[in-house]
Each structure stands twice: as structure tokens, then as C-alpha cells.
């Protein structure tokens, strides 16, 4: 099974000539996974280069750091975000980060790790709009010359972070790591990792 997130499908096929039309009445169906689910796939990641942190130019303004989406040619793919790292590198700056699903990034370039990857990412976007999107999780970090705190993704329900597609419009839904700071010009580094289970 390559796309376990799609609906069940039942078909009736005649293998021989029949005297009348065949009918099939399907009442219900169930899929059960005993023993839970362990994500096993190809690991991939996107990160801001160590020498090019994102500059949060205006205080309290939210900037996109990394955006992910399924490739338009791989909308049947299953990719699940499984790691997050946000590191504020400006001394005495406080940072707020969020994982947003369904927002839209503007500017920058969408690239991919490899031709076989299900996912493309954008680390150069200039702005983003929440629109009809929603914040899945959020947190805070602080930059200090005594040692900065880092952010981590809660791993209790990773399926909440599965990359989605709009099946009615055949378009991918963006998953965006955004951040803001209380200090104008604060710099931040970030990375996102994910598993691709049906490459």
C-alpha cells in the first residue's frame, strides 16, 4: 500500500458474461493497525546555512524560516515532519517560533534534496501569510552568550505534522516554520527533518 491516507475503495468486476447488470452493496469498511505504527522511511532535512542565519529585521514581525510541501508530481506521497531545531544566536533576544499548516510563503525558491524526494522546501522566502492556515505548535527560545536554548518538536503524535494535499484542487499544503523576536535585527538558525515513507 503506497498511500494509506487515501479512502478505501471497493470495485466489482465481471469476469464472464452475465445475463443482467451486476450490483454491489458495500456497507462499511475498517482498517485496523494492531501494535501501533512506527515511522520507517527515508530521512531528509532542510536547514538554514550556518553562515547565513535568518535576520528578523523588525521586532515582533513573523518571518518564514523554512517551508515544506509535497511536490506537485508526488501528491500521493506520505511525508511526516519528525524533527525541529530553532536556535536564536543574538545575545539577550527572545524568540517565538511556530509550525503553521496551510499558510502561504512569498518569494524565495523551492528546491528539493533529490529527484526521488517527495518534498520540496524553501529557505529563502521573504514573507508569509497565515490566511486560512492554523498554528499546530509553538514555543519560545532565548539567545544568550551563556548558551542559547533550542526548540524541539514534541514526538507524541507525529501524524499531526504530516504534509497534506488538497484533494479537490490537487495542490500541496505548506507546512511552515516561522519565527519572530522582541529584538530588531535578531538572527536565528533553524532546521526541519522529515521521513518519506513511500519514496
Tell where the protein language model's regions lie, with residue ranges.
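C-terminal interaction-tip segments
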Residues: 31, 170-172, 180-199
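Non-catalytic interaction/regulatory modules that flank or connect domains
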Residues: 67-116
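A short beta-strand element within beta-rich, extracytoplasmic domains
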Residues: 77-91, 173-180, 188-191
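Terminal beta-strand-rich extracellular "head" domains
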Residues: 102-154
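Beta-sandwich interaction modules
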Residues: 140-174
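Noncatalytic modules at the cell exterior or secretory-pathway interfaces
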Residues: 3-16, 84, 162-183
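Generic structural motif
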Residues: 15-17, 92, 102-104, 182, ...
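Ligand-recognition surfaces built from glycine- and aromatic
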Residues: 1-77, 95-97
